[in-house]
Each structure stands twice: as structure tokens, then as C-alpha cells.
Swiss-Prot record:
Signal peptide: none annotated. It comes from Brucella melitensis biotype 1 (strain ATCC 23456 / CCUG 17765 / NCTC 10094 / 16M). The gene is glmS. The lineage of its organism: Bacteria, Pseudomonadati, Pseudomonadota, Alphaproteobacteria, Hyphomicrobiales. The active site is at C2, K602. The keyword Cytoplasm applies. This is Glutamine--fructose-6-phosphate aminotransferase [isomerizing].
Amino acid sequence: MCGIIGIIGNDEVAPRLVDALKRLEYRGYDSAGIATLQNGRLDRRRAEGKLVNLEKRLAGEPLPGVIGIGHTRWATHGRPVEHNAHPHITTRLAVVHNGIIENFAELRAMLEAEGRKFETETDTEAVAHLVTRELEKGKSPVEAVRDCLPHLKGAFALAFLFEGDEELLIGARQGPPLAVGYGEGEMFLGSDAIALAPFTDTISYLEDGDWAVLTRNGVSIYDENNKPVERPVQKSQNTNMLVSKGNHRHFMQKEMFEQPEVISHTLANYLDFTTGKVRKEAIGIDFSKVDRLTITACGTAYYAATVAKYWFEQIARLPVDSDIASEFRYREMPLSKDSLAMFVSQSGETADTLASLRYCKAQGLKIASVLNVTGSTIARESDAVFPTLAGPEIGVASTKAFTCQLSAMASLAIAAARARGAIDEVREQELVHQLSEAPRFINQVLKLEDQIAVVCHDLSKVNHVLYLGRGTSFPLAMEGALKLKEISYIHAEGYAAGELKHGPIALIDETMPVIVIAPSDRLYEKTVSNMQEVAARGGRIILITDKKGAESASIDTMATIVLPEVPEFISPLVYALPIQMLAYHTAVLMGTDVDQPRNLAKSVTVE
């Protein structure tokens, strides 16, 4: 969601702040701004819309100074317009904020009663006035921030810059991530290591309740009880590889085409293709002692979790609940301490997923996580971490992170099956071999891009689309619908094909495309029956199947996308590609912002 950067250094800071903000664009935003100090005086520039608008503003109205803070805003309180953009300033300070101040209305009412005037609709401005009030009592900036933090309720990451003090930045974290970066004679604050990559690869992550005082020469970190603490210093990895789209039009397209390579890396981390066995040293969980698995996630990660539910139940004979994190955390479900709680997140900072993890941890469950960012909060609070190794994913609509999540959990399902005695060594080798073939099949599917792009000419002209699938193709149908509405803004729904007669069939007419995901597996004939029901009502079918399925369908389709014939186990990995390409090329034809679709954020760090 919102992105934060702070720099205290020796070089002109404005271009460095903008460079860092560009690296935070992937998080999603609707406005941006920076503030600097020059000769002790605060000044700022803000702009609605993309960073290019801020750059134009700065070209005409430069901001000098070697210390500053910057922000990309994803609106929560107040419209996405310039006067609500960060940084927010008073006569004494500038502040940027990621998160939600839940008691801002109460704080605002108190401050307005004291005669303080608010200029924006945001919750952040209440923080600015609250700290300013303490400064006006004669407190130092450190004392003022320290004394205000206990009065803030909600989730927040904050960075402060103070009028008249070019030697000080203060940051605070309660929920959304905030990292401290270490340089030579300069220091940094950032929402993640990606933002700090141009300047340093040496970072510490603040923990919940921490606040940090930065000078050019170092940092002092305090916990929620105001006691000095040290946080581990670590080297960040692979944060510079995101800056180029290469020969691709969008990051999303680039990331789709990276999938054969990154999936190979993921699988090789968990599987030994020479012996055909799971790498036991990579697992870190004794599945023989697990009697139930709960997998919790949000968005695309939830659909990956739902695919994995089928795998764990069918292959490992392990009962599984897959839950949406924002619902799970409030269900107050009974949990057995012999259960394993697994959490899936690209960023490792998803607010609802993290809250669900903490709920399970409080119940005494062992915690596992499947993550792309291994230095994240969820990783640090897990007993076992299973990295997806997808590399930075910049497009808001997930592609390679999704298939790498599937790859990791498919490997874990084999490990669980072997540990529980549900499969023998021969079957383990068969399944490992099938997964080893997935990158080759995915490469073949990528060669169908031009054919799929042609299908999208008709798809881009409709207002509603229905996706259908059975078995593991059902969560793929939901993921396909999510992809299409995320980036093309076409309304789409994903349903289990067997549910067609229980409501969705009422929507079918000659204007309604129905995308059917149907490999020629044991469920294919049932899905054909559903396609016949659609065809009988004039619905236009886009069938995604293999050669055998295409030849036996005997139904007129709007288009048929023929994929390689693959084993049922790996079909979700292979069939994920065409639904990504359908969404991508439809969005391109419609002229939307594919990498940064409206109203969406890459990392959802507030509830």
C-alpha cells in the first residue's frame, strides 16, 4: 500500500527520494510527495496521480536539501487528491504515514477543540498536529514523538522530519513494515529493502512497537516500553533486479515469461530431481505428527492455498481447511495443537494474514509460512518458512508469485504424503518427475501468446465474464476472474462448474462469454455437460483444454485454447498461464494501467 522513504545524507536528496519512490510504485498509489529541509526550513512538493507528475512539479520548483522524506499514497481516509497527499506539514514538522489511525476522529475532535485547524481529510494530519502540540510544550522532537505514540491506535509506519533540525529523522512502526538502512555517513528509512536498494543493502527491520532515532552517524532503536534495543542487521538480496522491463511492454508480461525459470528454482529448492525425492532438509516440518492443516491467505494467495488443499487431501490424505484471512481471524474456530497453521503471502506483510498467524500462535499451533519475502514480519514470526524464490514481483496482479506458491506447496504435499505413509517411494518419484516437467510445459504454453491475444479482441468488448472449473480448476477459475477484473476492470466471477445450475446459469445469454478451464482429466465429462448447458442458452464458450479435450468436446466454441496434455497433478501450474495471458492482453487492448491498476495495492498492510 503506501510507501515511505527517508534519507539523511550528504547529497541532494530530492532526486534520491524520487528514485526510491519509483521502486515503491509496485505497492500501488494514487498520489506522491516529498519534503526536505534546507537551512532549517521545511518545504514540500506533492502531486496527484503518477510520479511523473511529481517529477514535473520538481523540475519547475526544485527542492534543495540533503535530508528529506517521501511518500506514495494509497487513499484510505480522504479522496486521492493533492491536498490529501503526504507529506503533511505543520509549522514544526513534516510526517508521512502508511496505515490507518483508527482513533483519528477522536484525536481530531480533541485537537480542533484546542483551536488547531485541519487542512485535509486524512487521519495522518491528526498525528502531525498531535506531535506539534507536544513540541510547543517545549519537548524535544524525540520526546514529542515518544509521548505521542501511545495515543495512536491502529496500524502505522511513520517517518518524521523536523523544522530547524537537519541532523534528525524519526521513524515508528506498529503493523506495516519499516526498515532502517545503513550507509557511509548517511542513514535511511524505507517501507522495504527494495526502496533502499539504490543506497544500501544493509538493513534492520523495526518490530511492532519500535521507534527509531536516525542521525547521519547511526540509529538508536527503542521498543514500545522506550527501552533501547538492537535489531538484527541483515543483507538484503535481489532487490536491484526489478528496475527494467527488458523487452517487455509491462512488468506483468515480463513476470509471466519468467515463470519457467523461477518455478524451476522453486522446485529445485524442495526436490532432488536426480533421486526423485523430496529434499528433507528443506522441509522443516514433521508432517507425520500433523493431524490437520489450516492454510490461510488473501486474494491470489488464497486461491493458491485452495489448490493446495486438493493436493494435501488427495495425495497426503491430510484434512485441510483453506481460509480467507480476513474471515478466519474472526471465526474463533476451535484449533487442535496437533494442527499445523500455514500462511501464504507474497509480501509476508499482509495485515489480515499476519493477524491470523498471531491468533493461531496464541492457540499454541506450530506456524509455517509460504513467502516470497523471507525477511518479512510473517517470516520472522513463523516456526518454518518455505520461500517461493520468485524474485521481486512488480506487477500488482500476481503471476509468477502465484505459480511459485503452487510449486512450493505441491512439493510440500509430496513431503507430507511420504511422511504420513500415504505414498511409497515409487509414487514419490513419479510425482517429483511430473513437477520437474512443469517448466517445459509452461514454456510451450507461453508460445501460444499470439493466439491468446487474438481471443482477447472479443473479450475486451464485453461487460461480464464467467469462469468455470472443477477440482483444482475451480480455484483457477476464481483466480482467472480475479485477474481479469483486477487489470481490465471487466466484471468477472469464478464458479465451480457444478454450481452453474444453482444460480449463475440465469446470467447466460449470447452476450456472456464463459471461460471453461477443463483439462481432459477424470472430471472432464462432467464439465462438458456444463458446457452444453451454456451452449444451449446461447452462451459463448472459451474452452481451455488439451488436444484430447478439444477433440472430444463436440461443442461450438467462441475459441478453444489447446494446451499440452499434462498429468492431473501439475495441471494447475500449466493452466495458470492462459488465464494470466487472457487477462493481460484484454487489459492491454482496453488501455488500462496493467502494472498499477486503479484502487489496488501490491502489499495490503492495513485491514
